[in-house]
Curated annotation (Swiss-Prot):
Its EC number is 2.5.1.61. It comes from Idiomarina loihiensis (strain ATCC BAA-735 / DSM 15497 / L2-TR). The gene is hemC. PANTHER family: PORPHOBILINOGEN DEAMINASE. This is Porphobilinogen deaminase. It comes from the Bacteria. Pathway: Porphyrin-containing compound metabolism; protoporphyrin-IX biosynthesis; coproporphyrinogen-III from 5-aminolevulinate: step 2/4.
Amino acid sequence: MTQRVRIATRKSKLALWQAEHIQQRLEELHPGLSVELVPMSTKGDVILDTPLAKIGGKGLFVKELEVAMLEGRADIAVHSMKDLPVEFPPGLELHTICEREDPRDAFVSNNYKNLNELPEGAVVGTCSLRRRCQVKEQFPHLVIKDLRGNVQTRLRKLDEGEFDAIILAASGLIRLELGDRITSFIPVEQSLPANGQGALGIECRSDDDEMKALLAPLQCQETRTRVLAERAMNRGLDGGCQVPIGAYAELEGDEVYLRGLVGEPDGGKVLRDEVRGPASKAEELGSELAERLLKQGAAEILSAVYDSESSHS
C-alpha cells in the first residue's frame, strides 16, 4: 500500500492553503500516511504583466503540475476547479471533487456596499472576462480595469486607491481567513459564477488505483454532480478558463437546475439560458445548455474573444 503521497501545487498562498487542506484531510483519514507538498510555478503565475485573456490558452495554471505527475515527481495535484481545463492529458484524470465552498463572487470595497452603490466612473478591478461582461452589461457607467496578482496583491491595490472596488471569488477570501474583507456577496443573478467556482478538484494518474482508493473518501457527491453539469456546459462551448462564460448548477432534490451565460466582454450582448432535469443526467444537461446557447449565437461571441486573444499573443 502507498505510504507516501506527493501533492503538486502552485506556490500562491491560496494554492498552498488548498494543498495543505487536502494534505491534512488525507493524514486524518489514513494514519501513518506521509503527505508532502511539491510547490512549483506555472505559466499563469509567472506572466503577471499581461491580462490572462491575452496570454490565452487553456490550463495556464495546471500544465507544469501535470508534467510533474506524468514524470513521477508528484502523485496528485490539487486545483481550483474553475482553473481546470475540461480535457486532460493522456494518463491523467480528474478523480475527486471535494465539498464546495461558497461559489459566489465577492464585492470588496472600502467605501461602497455593493455594485449598485458605485457612482459613474468608479473603477472596478477584475481579471475575469466573465465578471467584466456581467458588470458592464448591468452597470455601463462603471470603468473596468484589469487586476492581476495573488489575493493579497489585489487587496493591496484596492487599499492603495487604484480601484474603488474589486471583485474576487468569495471562496478564496474565506479560505485565506480574509472573509472579513468581503463587503457583500454578489447574487448569482447579478454575477453568475464560473464553472466549478469554489470547488477543489484532485487530479491523479489514471492507472494509480492505490491513490484513487486513498482519495475516495474526499469525494463530495453533491458538489460533483453540480460541477460536472457546469463543466459539461463549458466543454460543449469549447471554453477555457479565461472566457466570458458563466455556469451555475444547483441541486433541488434529485433535480439539477443549471444556468449558463456567454457574453461579449464589453457587456454589449449577453446570452442566458437555463435547463432542469434529473441529477443522474447532469452532464447531458450541461451539453444541452451549451447547445441552446450555441443556437443563440454563443460561438460567434467566443470566436471573437479568441481572435482578440490570438492577435495580442
